[in-house]
């Protein structure tokens, strides 16, 4: 990917949502909600404090994260959809 986030921003790729329910019913595209879970694919250098120091981010590339429904800005790079958001928009990291 040729996109590098700045400062405390991260780039997230949404996970693919299931097209079939547990009961075997297929969900049409128009009825699906966008998932609020994704994988971090790039991180910025960190958040700059008022005194000029850079605080490293808590999330790292490869982390599975949960974020708010309206978090981030959707972008398309090389035909792939991504979200650019601040680390503050992350609600939690899914531990393995």
Curated annotation (Swiss-Prot):
Q: Which residues form a coiled coil?
A: none
Give a Gene Ontology cellular component term annotated to this protein. cytoplasm
Q: Pfam families in the record, alphabetically?
A: Cpn10 (PF00166)
**CDD domains registered for this protein in UniProt:** cpn10
Q: Which Gene Ontology biological process is one annotated for this entry?
A: chaperone cofactor-dependent protein refolding
What are the UniProt keywords, alphabetically? Chaperone, Cytoplasm
Provide the protein's localization: Cytoplasm
Q: Which domain of life is it from?
A: Bacteria
What are the protein's GO molecular function terms? ATP binding; metal ion binding; protein folding chaperone; protein-folding chaperone binding; unfolded protein binding
Recorded hits in InterPro entries, A to Z, give: Chaperonin_GroES (IPR020818), Chaperonin_GroES_sf (IPR037124), GroES-like_sf (IPR011032)
UniProt-listed PANTHER family: 10 KDA HEAT SHOCK PROTEIN, CO-CHAPERONIN GROES
Q: Which family does it belong to?
A: Belongs to the GroES chaperonin family.
| Role | Together with the chaperonin GroEL, plays an essential role in assisting protein folding. The GroEL-GroES system forms a nano-cage that allows encapsulation of the non-native substrate proteins and provides a physical environment optimized to promote and accelerate protein folding. GroES binds to the apical surface of the GroEL ring, thereby capping the opening of the GroEL channel.
Check the record and name the NCBIfam families matching this protein: PRK00364.1-2 (NF001527), PRK00364.1-5 (NF001529), PRK00364.1-6 (NF001530), PRK00364.2-2 (NF001531), PRK00364.2-4 (NF001533), PRK00364.2-5 (NF001534)
Oligomer status and interactors: Heptamer of 7 subunits arranged in a ring. Interacts with the chaperonin GroEL.
| This protein's name | Co-chaperonin GroES
Q: Which organism is it from?
A: Geotalea daltonii (strain DSM 22248 / JCM 15807 / FRC-32) (Geobacter daltonii)
Species lineage: Bacteria, Pseudomonadati, Thermodesulfobacteriota, Desulfuromonadia, Geobacterales
